[in-house]
Amino acid sequence: MSESLHLTRNGPILEITLDRPKANAIDAKTSFAMGEAFLNFRDDPELRVAIITGGGEKFFSAGWDLKAAAEGEAPDADFGPGGFAGLTEIFDLDKPVIAAVNGYAFGGGFELALAADFIVCAENASFALPEAKLGIVPDSGGVLRLPKLLPPAIVNEMVMTGRRMSAEEALRWGVVNRVVSQSELMESARELAQQLVNSAPLAIAALKEIYRATSEMPVEEGYRYIRSGVLKHYPSVLHSEDALEGPQAFAEKRDPVWKGR
């Protein structure tokens, strides 16, 4: 594993810290390591939730390492499994990822956060996609994911001018889930992670699968699709031990014991 990444397992929760002073910028080597970490998370049955954060208090990630670019690393270089930053192109990840944004999330750093399922950010965090000012485009998900969250006028301003969005503005638009003080950031992310652990893993996998499959469908078509039998997790949930355990635990006034089957 790259020395730029620190991995910490807290039971079913994996914490990934990107630590590349000064700006936690990501070159191809680091991106490969991040991809390996996220794929291992995906495939490890003992892990339920991942938290990705940046080292320090100023930068979550400045995105693509422009020093590496100046030394010849191409914008379309091979950034490894999972695409840039290891997460932006993992399309079969059925476990939740929380981005704990501790500072500036610019370019690919913002795209990394957008690829997560939840964003918890510090009050000093800000977000931007300045690629057009560098002669490139935010093609690691920014130009695809941001329009699903914001009105076209706001998206156009951000991607065409590189305008920054503050943490509070991101919260107002629903881009992030929570804004907390820097000192409370990881505590808040861990609290959210534990809430996710308390939910049934098969149910969460089914929810992510359904979102992916039906997000562009009309509601009626979505109903037909999820009941057609083509999905992997949804039918499994309906006939799982966990589907029996949940109501039984509720009736017995105890916490459920999830088996993931």
Curated annotation (Swiss-Prot):
InterPro entries: Carnitinyl_CoA_dehydratase, ClpP/crotonase-like_dom_sf, Enoyl-CoA_hyd/isom_CS, Enoyl-CoA_hydra/iso, Enoyl-CoA_hydra_C. GO terms for biological process: carnitine metabolic process; fatty acid beta-oxidation. Pathway: Amine and polyamine metabolism; carnitine metabolism. Keywords: Lyase. It is an enzyme of class 4 (lyase). Transmembrane segments: none annotated. Pfam families: ECH_1. The keyword Nucleus does not apply. One of its GO terms (molecular function) is hydro-lyase activity. It comes from the Bacteria. Catalyzes the reversible dehydration of L-carnitinyl-CoA to crotonobetainyl-CoA. This is Carnitinyl-CoA dehydratase. It comes from Salmonella typhimurium (strain LT2 / SGSC1412 / ATCC 700720). The gene is caiD.
